Amino acid sequence: FFVDQGDKNWNFSYIDTSIDQGIATVTINRPEAMNALNETVVSQLGDALDLVNADDSVHTIVLDGAGKAFVAGADVKFFVDKIRADAIPDIVEFTANGHIVLDKLESSSKTTVALTTGLALGGGLELALACDYRIGTRRTQFRFPETSIGIYPGLGGSQRHARICGLPAARLACFAGEFMAGSATSDH
């Protein structure tokens, strides 16, 4: 879990990557926070995607989340701390970096698969929507919870959702902000 940074401090690694027979499995490993996205996770995920996208032996990228959630969205504590510190530019930078990471997934020449075994909320759902395929289980639940408090999906989720599932399903997901079971989403 720890990555040696040479002369620098040790950093905790939240992204585990393995390659087997051309399939790169990229696991977001922050189960204590339900794999919530923060600055470090987004940065490390971007680095991991750069590495596997550049590896000619890789033909498929599988995204997974450790523990009970795929990704439970953005880390709310990050936003609260930044707002309290009047550091709104940090939130803007985080969002811009999130767009870059999702664009790396969406534009990858590799086949991309989100293995959504558990919750895929907010930014986690947006991450899944940036992949070519989303595979769920009976435990899988999708939701844009931010819409229930008047915040729109900030990483392109409303646009990707409409392209993949159609406008009626995207409207339901974005306007209602309700949980959708994985089985229900297969209808869209």
Q: Predicted regions: what is each one?
A:
Residues 1-66, 89, 100-103:
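Conserved CoA-thioester-binding segment of acyl-CoA-metabolizing enzymes
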Residues 26, 63, 75, 127-128, ...:
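Hydrophobic/aromatic residues within transmembrane alpha-helices
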Residues 36-39, 72, 81, 175, ...:
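Phosphate-coordinating loops and pocket residues in cytosolic domains that bind phosphorylated ligands
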Residues 65-101, 120, 148-150:
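Glycine- (often His-adjacent) and acidic-residue-rich active-site loop
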Residues 104-188:
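Crotonase-fold acyl-CoA enzyme core
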